[in-house]
Every structure is written in structure tokens, then in C-alpha cells.
Amino acid sequence: MSELTTVARPYARAAFEFAVDSNKIEAWSEMLFFTAEVVNNPTMVKILTSDKTAQELAELFLNVCEDQLDENGQNFIKIMAENGRLRFLPRVAQLFAALEDEHKKQVDVNVVSAYGLSKKQLDELSKSLEKRLARKVNLHCSIDKTLIAGMVVTVGDLVIDSSAKGQLGRLSNTLQS
């Protein structure tokens, strides 16, 4: 995954900077996610791993995408094809989305709770996280009964574990040391 990210990051940044400069962030996001779907198609996977030249791959790819790409999007695909990077488009789209969220001061938050949370609890959690993170929060909730009680909140690499399962695990580690 790290090679994938290392290779995809400069393309995502370049696309994002261009999208911001041309005020077309939403259009670029749609184009990149469409091309990511094309790359993930099983037939296209076979074609991308074949011995076709970069120019043949670019032409074929652009024919498949037809009207989904504007002129700049087509040029982006041609550059990626010339550099043998078309297979990295799904990761480019993901990184582009992360840059878009950062630009919009948004963050995705995963909330795993032992039981379903009420609308009031979700609103309070959202307000609290928005204040702490200084970002607009998009909550993604799920239920895991093995937590016993409480919740685990994950924001990027920040994990806030207030579950009974987590507390019992920490207590066990403390007692064993």
C-alpha cells in the first residue's frame, strides 16, 4: 500500500491543485472516481497488464471513458498512461478525495458503538468532535456488541476508545505489568 500511495500522491496533488486553480474540484472528483471504476473493471485489469503501448492504452482508456472526461482530464490520463501509472487511478481518486476534504475543512469519523446511538447523542458527539478537531465532521456509525458498552471513535490515526472492552483490556495490561 505504501508504494501505491507514494506513486499516486504526486498525481493526486497535481490534479487537485489544477482543480482548485480552475475552480473545478467537484468535476475532477467525479472524473477521477469514474476512471477508478474503469480501472477496477476486470476486463480493464487484463488490458492494463497486457503488452500494449502507452499510446494504445491511453486511446483505449479514453474510448471507454468517452464523454466522462473533459480535455484536461483526457490529458491527465495520457500522462498517466505514458508513465505506466493508469493502474494507480483508484488510489489517486482516494487521495484526491482526502485533499478535497482537507480543503473543505471536513473529516470522516468512524464511530463504533456497543448499541445504536440516538439522534441527540450523535448531534452531541458531532458538535464535540467539530469543536475539538476544528473541522466539519462526517460521522460513519456502526454497531459492535463485543464492545460491551461505550464506543470507539476513529479519526485518521487518532483513536478514542471509551468502550468497556477497551477499558478492560487496559486494566488487564496494567495488572499484568
Swiss-Prot record:
One GO CC annotation: proton-transporting ATP synthase complex
Xref: InterPro entries: ATP_synth_OSCP/delta_N_sf (IPR026015), ATPase_OSCP/dsu (IPR000711)
Keyword field contains Translocase: no
Family: Belongs to the ATPase delta chain family.
Role summary: F(1)F(0) ATP synthase produces ATP from ADP in the presence of a proton or sodium gradient. F-type ATPases consist of two structural domains, F(1) containing the extramembraneous catalytic core and F(0) containing the membrane proton channel, linked together by a central stalk and a peripheral stalk. During catalysis, ATP synthesis in the catalytic domain of F(1) is coupled via a rotary mechanism of the central stalk subunits to proton translocation.
PANTHER family: ATP SYNTHASE DELTA CHAIN (PTHR11910)
NCBIfam families (UniProt xref): ATP_synt_delta (TIGR01145), PRK05758.2-2 (NF004402), PRK05758.2-5 (NF004404)
Protein name: ATP synthase subunit delta
Organism: Psychromonas ingrahamii (strain DSM 17664 / CCUG 51855 / 37)
Species lineage: Bacteria, Pseudomonadati, Pseudomonadota, Gammaproteobacteria, Alteromonadales
